[in-house]
Curated annotation (Swiss-Prot):
It comes from Bacillus licheniformis (strain ATCC 14580 / DSM 13 / JCM 2505 / CCUG 7422 / NBRC 12200 / NCIMB 9375 / NCTC 10341 / NRRL NRS-1264 / Gibson 46). It holds the Pfam family Ribosomal_S14. The keyword Ribosomal protein applies. This is Small ribosomal subunit protein uS14A. PANTHER family: 30S RIBOSOMAL PROTEIN S14, SMALL RIBOSOMAL SUBUNIT PROTEIN US14M. It comes from the Bacteria. The keyword rRNA-binding applies. InterPro entries: Ribosomal_uS14, Ribosomal_uS14_bac/plastid, Ribosomal_uS14_CS, Ribosomal_uS14_sf. Keywords: Ribonucleoprotein, Ribosomal protein, RNA-binding, rRNA-binding. Signal peptide: none annotated. Part of the 30S ribosomal subunit. Contacts proteins S3 and S10. Gene3D superfamilies: 30s Ribosomal Protein S14, Chain N. GO terms for biological process: translation.
Amino acid sequence: MAKKSKIAKEKKRQKLVEQYAELRKELKEKGDYRALSKLPRDSAPARLHNRCEVTGRPRGYMRKFKMSRIAFRELAYKGQIPGVKKSSW
């Protein structure tokens, strides 16, 4: 389990990115890079890092399921992820 402060910081960044998305887009179209640089640093989408919804783990993230490989494996074995089953051939 990741530190709660790291998870909270990532959520805060996500909110800032959503809040400034329109303004950022307009400034980029105008080419006003000075105003862009005055926006909060955490409002840049490049600073976001995908984290597992279950554990908050930043590595081994599976985009399709929004969770880490470890949490995915545990939930898949329990049958708690719809449409996922153990393969056999």
